[in-house]
Amino acid sequence: MKTAMGLLLAIAATAVQADNLVVNVNLGGSASEQSAAFGVTHLEKGAFSDTFNFSPSAGTYAVDASLVTLGFSPRTDVTFTAAYVNGHELTLSGPGLFEYGFLLPAVITGPLALTVFGYVDFEDTSLTPASASYAGTLNISAVPEPGGYALLLAGLGVVAAAGLKRRRQGA
């Protein structure tokens, strides 16, 4: 009896869990600006937590991101509940047929990971699977290190000092 009850609880628990995904995404572009597109399809009803790891991503970047989903039937509808890039929260639209999310440019130190929380929910109690998807983009621009700014200021100071010295010698 205990085994049967435990088996039923295990089946019930898995019935409301969607597939949680971890996806590695390669950024492409130049050394100063890179971008990537990503997307997933959830085939199970329930809550999900998806993580996208972006590479290469060591360094400090100005990062912006977007998410979008469009589902006209309940089986194809994803509802976003939260999304974060390294703890920076994306602004999400409300639940509906068309949902989106975005992160305005923010300075973030890598490695970069986007975590998306949401759910696929529909009333049908049959074993028909879901087929709900969403997609997005992540863009990065290199941000100079503070040491780079210090070198720039030091260089400008040397140029200014040389200009003053010439000016005094010419007078």
Give the label of every model feature segment.
Residues 19-142:
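Mature extracellular "passenger" or substrate-interacting domains of secreted, surface-exposed proteins
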Residues 99, 165-166:
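Intrinsically disordered, low-complexity segments used for protein-protein interactions
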